[in-house]
Design a protein with these regions (language model features):
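Bacterial N-terminal signal peptides
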Residues: 1-11
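Low-complexity, Ser/Thr/Pro/Gly-enriched N-terminal "stalk/linker" regions
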Residues: 13-85, 96-131, 135, 186, ...
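Sec/Tat-exported extracytoplasmic proteins
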Residues: 56, 95-98, 114, 118, ...
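Aromatic-rich carbohydrate-recognition surfaces in CAZymes
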Residues: 80-87, 134-160
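Solenoid-repeat scaffolds in large eukaryotic assemblies
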Residues: 90, 102-103, 164, 171
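Aromatic- and glycine-enriched pocket-lining scaffold segments that form the walls
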Residues: 153-210
Length: 210
């Protein structure tokens, strides 16, 4: 996956000792670049990240596949399926690489094949589908929902909401649906509202742990 590839970059570095920051990026409005802090130039870091991105999305061992007119999916190659974790992670990568075209294609696939539009799981996404869009399971996996919301809010701030997809509205729809769920129909918020932690799954069993 993209995250595994990035982990390899980290492993290949010989970093200097890094000091933790006292304040996070939300407060400082500045993201730290630990690769630059480790002694690499910004140009080297950008080139390496671009190389990994191109390999994972377009290389011979890619996980990204474009289908139909304007859709795409990120495949779990080992299990030969499409999972909300991979799709939402793919959206996070796309928005951070400023690839609106990729982001929109992945999200359209999610909307068409994965997102529930009615019933107790409305707003949530079926966690696993076949590559043709047929659902392997109906239930959601909470980390996918969390990354969907985060990626959509990033996209709203980067590209605005009048360029084809209203990203903020889509994020709010997921959140509004989540906060309307109280477990009475066997489905909860994907965040445990007591402990303020992501749940394993938002059903009554997985809601108890992260």
């Amino acid at each position: 996956t993209v995250l595994s590839a990035v982990a390899l970059i980290v492993a290949s570095c010989a970093p200097k000792g890094l000091e933790p920051w006292d304040r996070g990026a939300f407060e400082t409005r500045e993201y730290r670049n630990v690769f630059v802090e480790a002694g690499y130039s910004p140009e080297e870091v950008d080139a390496k990240l671009q190389s990994v991105f191109e390999e994972v999305f377009f290389g011979p061992d890619k996980v990204y596949f474009e289908v139909e007119d304007s859709l795409a999916y990120v495949s779990d190659i080992k299990n030969q399926d499409v999972r909300t974790e991979g799709m939402s992670y793919g959206m996070m990568v796309a928005v951070q690489m400023d690839r609106k075209d990729i982001f929109d294609k992945i999200f359209r696939w999610c909307k068409k094949y994965m997102q529930h539009t009615e019933g107790p799981m409305e707003g949530y996404f079926a966690w696993s589908c076949k590559t043709d869009g047929t659902r392997n399971a109906q239930g959601p996996a909470s980390d996918g929902e969390l990354y969907y919301v985060t990626a959509l809010l990033f996209a709203s701030n980067r590209w605005g909401d009048d360029t084809g997809i209203d990203y903020k509205r889509e994020a709010r729809y997921i959140l509004d649906c989540a906060f309307a769920k109280d477990g009475s129909e066997g489905v909860n918020n994907f965040i445990n509202t007591e402990h303020k932690l992501i749940t394993f799954t938002p059903d009554n069993f997985g809601y108890r742990f992260t």
